C-alpha cells in the first residue's frame, strides 16, 4: 500500500466518523440520550451499525465524543468573553450572561452534557472518553478561575482559593439552570424568573469576593 493510499483511507475514516457524529448530534438533541437509537444514527450517517461500533464502543462513548467535540467550541467562545476588556467583576457578569444564554438556548445539550454524572443513564464509559470531557470541564473552570485570580491580584477581590471559588460558582450556576428546566422547582423562585435569579446569584458572589473597604 502506498503512502497516498494510506492517507486516502485515513481521510475516508475521518469523514465517516464525522458523518456519524453529525447524525448523532441531530438525534441526541431531538430525542435526548435515553431515547436516542443507534440504528437510526447509523442509518442517518449512511453506515452499517457494525461500522458505527468500530468507531464508538457504545451509545455512551458516542455521546461523550459528541460532547468533547462541541465542548471545544463552547470553551473558545467562553475564552473570548473572559478576555474582553473590563474589570474582573464586569467580566464575571459577562461570563454569567453568556453561560445562562448559551445553556438556555441549548437546553437539550445541557441535559445530555450532565448525564455524564449519572452512570445509570450512560452506562460504563471508556476512561479515555470520560477523561476528554473532564479536561474540557477543567479548561472551562480554569478560564473562570483566571478571571477571579486577576481580580485578587488587582485588589478588586479579597484573597481566596480561586479554584475553589470557580468550582462553587460553576456548581451553583448549573443548579439554577437545572431549576430553570424543572417546572416544580421553578415555582420555588416565586415571582422571579430563572434569569433574574441567576443574575442575583452572580451579584451575591461578587459581593462575597469584593475586597474589604479600607
Q: What is each stretch, according to the model?
A:
Residues 30-34, 85, 106, 154:
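Short coil/turn segments at alpha/beta junctions that flank glycine-rich nucleotide-binding fingerprints
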Residues 46-56:
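Short hydrophobic/aromatic patch on the recognition helix
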Residues 64-65, 75, 177:
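Short, Lys/Arg-enriched C-terminal cap helix and immediately downstream tail that follows
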Residues 101-146, 153-156, 163-164:
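Short secondary-structure transition hinges
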